[in-house]
From Swiss-Prot:
Main location: nucleus
GO cellular component terms attached to this protein's record: nucleus
Ranges where the record places region Disordered: 176-226
GO molecular function: DNA-binding transcription factor activity, RNA polymerase II-specific; metal ion binding; RNA polymerase II transcription regulatory region sequence-specific DNA binding
Claim: Metal-binding is one of the keywords in the record: yes
Gene: LMX1B
Annotated InterPro entries: HD, Homeobox_CS, Homeodomain-like_sf, LIM_Homeobox_TF, Znf_LIM
Protein name: LIM/homeobox protein LMX-1.2
Subcellular location: Nucleus
Function, as annotated: Specifies dorsal cell fate during limb development.
UniProt entry keywords in alphabetical sequence: Activator, Developmental protein, DNA-binding, Homeobox, LIM domain, Metal-binding, Nucleus, Repeat, Transcription, Transcription regulation, Zinc
């Protein structure tokens, strides 16, 4: 809660700094810059006695003219001393701001202070009232609800660029606290957009969502706007979401409502627009995060696929058996079995029926260790069953 201070001059409303300063200069002087005539001395010819040559503040070039202009302890060409906006030559007075010169008309149009209430210009000699960064005329420094002029020592609140006295601010606070969050934040249809919270004298039939919850709480008054009133409010909202006091008074006169109802409708409409913008921003951020996550996953999968190179197919090598590597003589019918001691351990001879695999040979794959099925079957067919061969050898032994 701020307390209004006394009126002050406009010159004391704005701080002065090295980068943001405004100064009216009345003393534009024209000085005679005489040219040296007559025979030059030896010092001038050698450069030791060369006179100091002025430099123009505007174009930063040396001034070789006979006459020059002096402004604020700086030198200017006559053609460079002109307004930065209208390019009009400055002869008697000028305004200096941010190292630029302006005429009086352009300076007031660009940098003159404006009243935050009526948006009109404030004269430099006029007393003003200031609230934070806002400057008001003495007559415009009043409450936007009761239109009571605020004076020195009055407590007020600056809310969304609008001035409220202490009593109206407390009434609005109590009124807004009685509204449920769902009603104030939810986005309604066009018919429900016209429902605003009026003053005490404008009570209409309407039921709130929380009227039955607390019997001690009074029923919340509502105002149902017509289609024409709603269109007028929306058209004004498209032009400016924060209309000034004159615009609100005009809308109230056109629609037949109070200024307070108009102000509350604009407050609710601004809250709805902020919520819609916030929801849209959240949806965009969620979509962007999902899209980014999908791109990251696809990039990871591509990296995993490229990091593993396919293995070369194993070269299958089949060990073929040579028919001449083993003999079939021991398996012939009617042969005498071995009679020497120890021969019964090798009844079929010392020749191995399988090739001896060289120890230096490297096996490139697991398939090198196995024989082809067709080769094994053919070998078994040629060799025969060893048990049958034993029976035949036994019968031939006892028969002899």
């Amino acid at each position: 809660m701020d307390i209004a201070s006394g009126p002050e001059s406009l010159e004391r409303c704005f701080p002065r700094g090295p980068t943001d300063c405004a100064k009216m200069l009345d003393g534009i002087k024209m000085e005679d810059h005489p040219l040296r005539s007559g025979p030059a001395t030896l010092g001038v010819l050698l450069g030791s006695e060369c006179p100091h040559q002025a430099v123009c503040e505007g174009c930063q070039r040396p001034i070789s003219d006979r006459f020059l202009m002096r402004v604020n302890e700086s030198s200017w060409h006559e053609e460079c001393l002109q307004c930065a906006v209208c390019q009009q030559a400055l002869t008697t007075s000028c305004y200096f701001r941010d190292r630029k010169l302006y005429c009086k008309q352009d300076y007031q149009q660009l940098f003159a202070a404006k009243c935050s209430g009526c948006m009109e210009k404030i004269a430099p000699t006029e007393f003003v009232m200031r609230a934070l960064e806002c400057v008001y005329h003495l007559s415009c420094f009043c409450c936007c609800v009761c239109e009571r002029q605020l004076r020195k020592g009055d407590e007020f609140v600056l809310k969304e660029g609008q001035l409220l006295c202490k009593s109206d601010y407390e009434k609005e606070k109590d009124l807004l606290s009685s509204v449920s969050p769902d009603d104030s934040d939810s986005v309604k249809s066009d018919d429900e957009d016209g429902d605003v919270k009026p003053t005490k004298g404008q009570v209409t039939q309407g039921k709130g969502s929380d009227d039955g919850k607390d019997p001690r709480r009074p029923k919340r008054p509502r105002t149902i706007l017509t289609t024409q009133q709603r269109r007028a409010f929306k058209a004004s909202f498209e032009v400016s979401s924060k209309p000034c006091r004159k615009v609100r008074e005009t809308l109230a006169a056109e629609t037949g409502l109070s200024v307070r109802v108009v102000q509350v409708w604009f407050q609710n409409q601004r809250a709805k627009m902020k919520k819609l913008a916030r929801r849209h921003q959240q949806q965009q951020e969620q979509q962007n995060s999902q899209r980014l996550g999908q791109e990251v996953m696809s990039n990871r999968m591509e990296g995993m696929m490229t990091s593993y190179t396919p293995l070369a197919p194993p070269q299958q090598q089949i060990v073929a058996m040579d028919q001449s590597s083993y003999g079939t003589d021991p398996f012939q019918q009617g042969l005498t079995p071995p009679q020497m001691p120890g021969d019964h351990m090798n009844p079929y001879g010392n020749d191995s029926i399988f090739h001896d695999i060289d120890s230096d040979t490297s096996l490139t794959s697991l398939s090198d260790c196995f024989l082809a099925s067709s080769e094994v079957n053919s070998m078994q067919a040629r060799v025969g069953n060893p048990i049958d061969r034993l029976y035949s050898m036994q019968s031939s032994y006892f028969a002899s």
